[in-house]
Amino acid sequence: MDILKSEILRKRQLVEDRNLLVENKKYFKRSELAKKEEEAYFERCGYRIQPKEEDQKPLTSSNPVLELELAEEKLPMTLSRQEVIRRLRERGEPIRLFGETDYDAFQRLRKIEILTPEVNKGLRNDLKAALDKIDQQYLNEIVGGQEPGEEDTQNDLKVHEENTTIEELEALGESLGKGDDHKDMDIITKFLKFLLGVWAKELNAREDYVKRSVQGKLNSATQKQTESYLRPLFRKLRKRNLPADIKESITDIIKFMLQREYVKANDAYLQMAIGNAPWPIGVTMVGIHARTGREKIFSKHVAHVLNDETQRKYIQGLKRLMTICQKHFPTDPSKCVEYNAL
């Protein structure tokens, strides 16, 4: 017991000798103690530690004016602690640093909001973001100016030039679903990019006043949004890692679209997106015997639109391209689906 007491006293005396405790604080950083012990060791060995440039120069912010303003105006806390925590979490910042008081956290939040007002935008509306991009393009055109007689093409949508025609694609569609997965993925990619190009050319051919109208901006934003939704699908097709069940369903959809069997294509789309069996709820495996709901869990009965957000987006983008395909390449009314979306 005496040995333990003497060790505690030795540790306490060591902390007091190193001057680690400030008057108003009851704790110290272990790194400071290690640094002091290292300095004492070098002094005993006869070495002299040269102070680093970082230690000589005071820490300055990238915005000294802001630091001066925050230091001079010590405003009282105008936000509750709960609101400060919420705003810090929205920006991905820690709610409290080591040794930080509530007021210090409030001051840190003020500094973050002034320097980086929108660091993390969080979950944003994709269509709203596309509309903002369209508005910014028009604003840049107004600010930059335009020479008289110059053709206004800088705000046109990007067109995917596939150097192919619908007749060539229809001929390629005859070989879909014959067992060559790599060829099927190439045809799917080519046809979807062809439809995106057809859609972009149609929107670019509009009059300028139509492009600048609210509905015109909405149509342009929808096309941009659809293109961004389909990028993960194009990436999977290019890397040949598209899941087999989704690949089979998309192959059927594209084949029916090339045959202009839009009702059958819509049925295949619903089969992929929604499925025809509910997902069993509750325990499906008890003991050695599976319950009846277990046998319904396989790819054809699963709603892929519910799997994750990425799949939901490119399935939605595929549905929009089905509408565009029927609009530009019509067939008999009995083989068409009534669309009011676009």
From Swiss-Prot:
Functional note: Participates in the second step of pre-mRNA splicing.
SUPFAM superfamilies in alphabetical order: Functional domain of the splicing factor Prp18, PRP4-like
Keyword RNA-binding: no
Keywords, ordered alphabetically: Acetylation, mRNA processing, mRNA splicing, Nucleus, Spliceosome
Subunit structure of this chain's protein: Heterodimer with PPIH. Interacts with PRPF4 and with the spliceosome. Part of a complex containing U4/U6 snRNPs.
Protein name, as recorded: Pre-mRNA-splicing factor 18
Species assigned in the record: Pongo abelii (Sumatran orangutan)
Entry-annotated residues carrying N-acetylmethionine: 1
Primary location: nucleus
Annotated Gene3D superfamilies: Functional domain of the splicing factor Prp18, Pre-mRNA processing factor 4 domain
GO CC, one annotated term: U2-type post-spliceosomal complex
